[in-house]
């Protein structure tokens, strides 16, 4: 039996980040539903991002399910390697 559930996706971002725009676009092209948390508008959320990402301060910070993907470069690399669809539950 195939698992058809899709993992929860969270992207921590800011309103001025071009890499956030690229990550958002890639996830949207994949048809992924995700939550976007703007850390420039909420310091408590920024602190949560820092804790969850192991102290990484750059944005975006992307999580697919329990997996910390990292930023846009890592997300793009997963897509090019054919792994992103699998992580999104689409493979």
Annotated model-derived regions:
Residues 2-13, 51, 81-82, 88-91:
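C-terminal alpha-helical interaction module
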């Amino acid at each position: 039996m195939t698992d058809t559930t899709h993992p929860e996706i969270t992207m921590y971002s800011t309103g001025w980040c071009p890499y956030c725009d690229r990550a958002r676009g890639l996830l949207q092209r994949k048809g992924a539903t995700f939550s976007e948390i703007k850390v420039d508008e909420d310091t408590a959320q920024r602190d949560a991002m820092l804790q969850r990402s192991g102290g990484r301060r750059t944005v975006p910070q992307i999580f697919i399910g329990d997996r910390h993907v990292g930023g846009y470069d890592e997300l793009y690399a997963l897509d090019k390697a054919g792994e992103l669809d699998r992580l999104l539950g689409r493979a």
